[in-house]
Curated annotation (Swiss-Prot):
HAMAP family: RecA (MF_00268). Belongs to the RecA family. GO terms for molecular function: ATP binding; ATP hydrolysis activity; ATP-dependent DNA damage sensor activity; damaged DNA binding; single-stranded DNA binding. The lineage of its organism: Bacteria, Bacillati, Cyanobacteriota, Cyanophyceae, Acaryochloridales. PANTHER family: MITOCHONDRIAL DNA REPAIR PROTEIN RECA HOMOLOG-RELATED (PTHR45900:SF1), RECA (PTHR45900). Can catalyze the hydrolysis of ATP in the presence of single-stranded DNA, the ATP-dependent uptake of single-stranded DNA by duplex DNA, and the ATP-dependent hybridization of homologous single-stranded DNAs. It interacts with LexA causing its activation and leading to its autocatalytic cleavage. Gene3D superfamilies: P-loop containing nucleotide triphosphate hydrolases (3.40.50.300). This is Protein RecA. ATP binds at G72, P73, E74, S75, S76, G77, K78, T79. InterPro entries: AAA+_ATPase, DNA_recomb/repair_RecA, DNA_recomb/repair_RecA_CS, P-loop_NTPase, RecA-like_C, RecA-like_N, RecA_ATP-bd, RecA_C_sf.
Length: 355
């Protein structure tokens, strides 16, 4: 509420408002309520996903202090993407935890993705209740920066595990997720911990129209997640007849902190993970940091290499150069976002004047 708006309030209303705010702050702590215009920082902090194309599609990266859902079919890159996010947090000095409900974490592969497995917190709970209680306690500790839960489908309620095979437990997992997320969500926002849930796809039985695909665990996660990423395998990468990776396509199905429905693509190399240098090169060419004439890539008028693979090899041999290019791409992207925001604000002012 601006000073102009406050000045329009009667002295009695203004006094009542200030008293209510002071009472709320006394009961729930300083900062529990504020005028949005008084916030010291309006921009949501982010962490890198490990793929520059996806970071830019997300508006800068994965938001801190939010719930994120990554879903898709099998072997589409869900765990790889989550492990890259963990590696980025650890690289910045943060603490990461992996709740392995599927009991399928491969430490060798995680290490290949530059995850510090010596300091990675890993839990392999037997029940869904135990897994979500572990997540809640880690979040409330305020010491953990990112938690990955792999996966929602493997969060089996205790009643189902202790019951007989074939016994019906309709809606039990959905109720478990709904109760847990109600409890966890507020603490996540306060502590700044990012919680990533990996999820699988299921088919709706008997559906004639619409999308037959749905995710497990009910609708609570769809509601509480600030970001939902739909990841798909769109191409198999080959050298001759030998397969060496996949091309992944990610659609930002939901985004509460930036415009949604953007799409990002990147390569995942078997045994190595996301080929981020390829992402940097593609985005650098798109925003004009690096130019291409024919097969030659050039920077500031100087040729780098001939062909995409050779240019990526050059960037791999010169990491400081690759870092410089990435910074310039992010700066160009931020300038584009600021320009579009200013244009939108100017248009709104014009509309207001016209009225």
């Amino acid at each position: 509420m601006s000073d102009t708006t406050l000045s329009l309030l009667s002295p009695e209303k203004r006094k009542a408002l200030e008293f209510a705010i002071s009472q709320i702050e006394r009961s729930f702590g300083k900062g529990s309520i504020m005028r949005l215009g008084d916030a010291t920082s309006m921009k949501v902090e982010t962490i890198s996903s490990g793929a520059l194309t996806l970071d830019l599609a997300l508006g800068g990266g994965l938001p801190k202090g939010r719930i994120i859902e990554i879903y898709g079919p099998e072997s589409s890159g869900k765990t790889t993407l989550a492990l890259h996010a963990i590696a980025e947090v650890q690289k910045a000095g943060g603490v990461a935890a992996f709740v392995d409900a599927e009991h399928a974490l491969d430490p060798t592969y995680a290490a290949a993705l530059r995850v510090d497995i010596q300091n990675l917190l890993v839990a392999q709970p037997d029940t869904g209740e135990a897994a979500l209680e572990i997540v809640d306690q880690l979040v409330r500790s305020t010491a953990v920066d990112i938690i990955v839960v792999d996966s929602v489908a493997a969060l089996v309620p205790r009643a189902e595990i202790e019951g007989d095979m074939g016994e019906s437990h309709v809606g039990l997992q959905a109720r478990l997720m709904s109760q847990a997320l109600r409890k966890i969500n507020g603490n996540i926002s306060k502590t700044g911990c990012t919680v990533i849930f990996l999820n699988q796809l299921r088919q709706k039985i008997g559906l004639t129209y619409g999308n037959p695909e749905t995710t497990t665990g009910g609708v609570a996660l769809k509601f509480y997640a600030s970001v939902r990423l739909d990841i798909r395998r769109v191409q198999t990468l080959k050298k001759g007849t030998e397969e060496f990776g996949i091309r992944a396509k990610v659609k930002v199905a939901k985004n509460k902190v930036a415009p949604p429905f953007r799409i990002a693509e990147f390569d995942i190399i078997f045994g190595k993970g996301i080929a981020n240098l390829g992402c940097i090169l593609d985005m650098a060419e798109e925003v004009g940091v690096i130019t291409r004439k024919g097969a030659w890539y050039s920077y500031n008028g100087e040729n780098l290499a001939q062909g995409r693979d050779n240019t990526i090899n050059y960037m791999e041999e010169n990491p400081s150069f690759a870092q410089e290019i990435e910074q310039q791409v992010r700066q160009r992207f931020d300038q584009r976002v600021a320009l579009s925001a200013n244009t939108a604000a100017y248009t709104e002012e014009e509309i207001g004047e016209g009225e």
